[in-house]
Design a protein with these regions (language model features):
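Serine-hydrolase catalytic machinery in alpha/beta-hydrolase-like enzymes
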Residues: 62-133, 137, 141, 145
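Peripheral terminal and inter-domain segments
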Residues: 275-370
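Alpha/beta-hydrolase fold nucleophile elbow
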Residues: 147-158, 179
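C-terminal catalytic histidine-bearing segment of alpha/beta-hydrolase fold enzymes
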Residues: 211, 217, 228-232, 239-282
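Conserved hydrolase catalytic core segment
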Residues: 167-177
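Gly/Ala-rich beta-loop-alpha elbow adjacent to hydrolase catalytic centers
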Residues: 157-161, 165
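Active-site nucleophile loop of the alpha/beta-hydrolase fold
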Residues: 99-101, 180-188, 213-216
Length: 370
């Protein structure tokens, strides 16, 4: 539904270098899953897209997108939707990038920019190609199919994924609006911390969430630096940089992977904090005043738009084919929604003026049937 709506609203055409091997029908609202073939890398990837409950219905509305590596461990997408829909963070599209069954070990190639030899095995070296896949192939693909804001994307990685995210920051801090770097395996790339330190002064307001588990301080099997060493080195490289909005967290009593759900819960709101509408004053209006807004409207493109009320007097906006959006009043004839940066104003004629991200659209009230 969202794909069709975006295309109907005139999303700009983009080249799509990725071949869709399969596009599974959604199993629930706000969920899409693709298997995409990358000619650049020569392999297929699974890409799962979760969209928040409050879906855009005005031309030009864009949402941030969080790109979660390792398929977000199956948690990032659903957790992100809950956080988006409850006002804990700015609503965002969650894009989880992973592998087909039996191919998860390709992460050892894709997530390491340099080769590493560990316990007699040599792997890695595919990070630059995977970085190009994300930035030049996957992001344009997602932005053509979903209302994702190209300037407000976030990269989220843990372990080797955290190492990859730190390497992307080191290459070009402005590649993403924000970075979530969890338990980065900096031991696998000894030059990483120095590169991050050199890149940090070039950042322009990047929001970074840096974490490690308290119990990750034990030495690596066979010796070498620890995850905690990597965390401390990255913290020193990023702390105090004027262009980096940094939050760092050591999760007490947690191991390498056990804190991952908390990493999502805490990290997403840092990189995408809830917007101003959440702090708007909610005025209380008489029931008779509320009732005058209820009715059927028509958008300029012909789509029906209705406003209804529930038993508690709350107002809801409905666009055909999409979930209802709750409306909270913040003054006479003015409403906002906490899950989208949007507002609705009723004028003297009873028509509505809906605004999203500075754009407006007028919806005329339908005449009552005789």
């Amino acid at each position: 539904m969202l794909v069709g709506l975006t295309l109907a609203l005139g999303a700009p055409a983009r080249a799509e270098p990725l071949k869709v091997v399969s596009d599974n029908p959604p199993v629930q609202p706000g969920y899409s899953r693709f298997v995409l073939h990358s000619d650049r890398i020569g392999r297929d990837f699974t890409v799962t897209v979760n969209t928040p409950g409050a879906i855009a219905f005005l031309p030009g509305q864009k949402l941030p997108a969080i790109y979660a590596l390792d398929s977000g461990y199956g948690l990032a997408g659903p957790q992100g939707v809950v956080l988006s829909n409850t006002g804990a963070m700015e609503p965002a599209i969650i894009v989880s990038v992973g592998y087909l069954p039996g191919q998860a070990l390709f992460r050892n190639t894709d997530l390491l920019h340099n080769k590493v030899t560990d316990h007699g095995a040599t792997y890695g070296g595919g990070g630059a190609a995977f970085e190009a896949f994300l930035l030049e192939d996957l992001k344009p693909f997602i932005e053509a199919k979903f209302p994702a804001d190209p300037a407000r994307s976030v990269l989220f990685g843990h372990s080797f994924g955290g190492l990859f995210a730190a390497n992307v920051f080191a290459d070009k801090p402005d590649a993403f609006y924000g970075y979530i770097i969890g338990s980065a395996s900096a031991w696998a790339d000894p030059a990483l911390i120095a590169r991050v330190a050199a890149a940090a002064p070039k950042a322009h307001g990047q929001r970074v969430y840096l974490t490690v588990g308290e119990k990750e301080g034990a030495g690596k099997p066979g010796g070498g630096s620890t995850m905690t060493d990597g965390y401390n080195g990255l913290l020193k490289a990023l702390k105090g940089q004027p262009g980096v909005i940094l939050k760092a967290q050591i999760y007490k009593s947690e191991t390498h992977l056990s804190y991952y759900p908390r990493l999502v819960t805490d990290g997403f709101p840092h990189v995408l904090p809830p917007g101003a509408p959440l702090g708007a004053y909610q005025a209380r209006l008489p029931d008779a005043t509320m009732a005058k807004y209820v009715g059927d409207y028509r958008l300029p493109d012909g789509r029906p738009f209705s406003i209804t009320t529930d038993k508690e007097g709350g107002l809801y906006g409905h666009v055909a084919g999409f979930p209802p959006i709750g409306l909270l009043q913040n003054g006479p004839d003015r409403f906002f929604t906490p899950t989208v940066d949007a507002n609705i104003t009723f004028d003297a004629t009873g028509a509505t003026l809906a605004g999203v991200d500075g754009g407006t659209m007028r919806a005329e009230r339908e005449k009552a049937k005789p």
